[in-house]
Amino acid sequence: MVYSHHHYDHIEGGKPFKDAGATFVAHMNAKTRLEALKNPDVVIPDIGTGNLHVIELGGTRLELHYVGRNHSDNSLVMLLPKEKLLFTVDFIPIESLQFRDFPDSFLPDFFDSFDRVPSVDTQNRPVVDT
């Protein structure tokens, strides 16, 4: 289970997965923040990552990239390189710069983090905003 970042709407509901034996991964800053909460309903990540963490599972490679401060100081970008799928959460704008007014957002760093997002040849595939 990968937490994209520490905000509650992205970390809630993990207990059944943990009970089933899942390993939880998040950026080290998210892990530190969640440990400080001391909330028994929040699963603390087992692994805190740095700038790059690779998960190989069943022949599939998932890369977790930390691209710097933006929507939070611990947002991860997820890349499936073989499939050419890139997942960003809450900080890549399609029509506007989203979610920039959270207390832990880093507006000056948003644009720098865009430059660090892994490049993917999309072969004219659509970009979907969620």
For the regions a language model picked out, list residue spans one by one.
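Active-site HxH/HxHxD metal-binding segment of metal-dependent hydrolases
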Residues: 1-54
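Catalytic cores of transferase enzymes with a strong primary signal for eukaryotic protein kinases
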Residues: 2, 60, 80
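Short Gly/Pro-enriched turn/cap motifs at secondary-structure boundaries
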Residues: 44-46, 66-69
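Short, P/G- and charge-enriched loop/turn segments at secondary-structure junctions
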Residues: 51, 63-66
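Metallo-beta-lactamase
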Residues: 54, 68-130
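Short, isolated positions in well-ordered beta-strands
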Residues: 62-63, 85
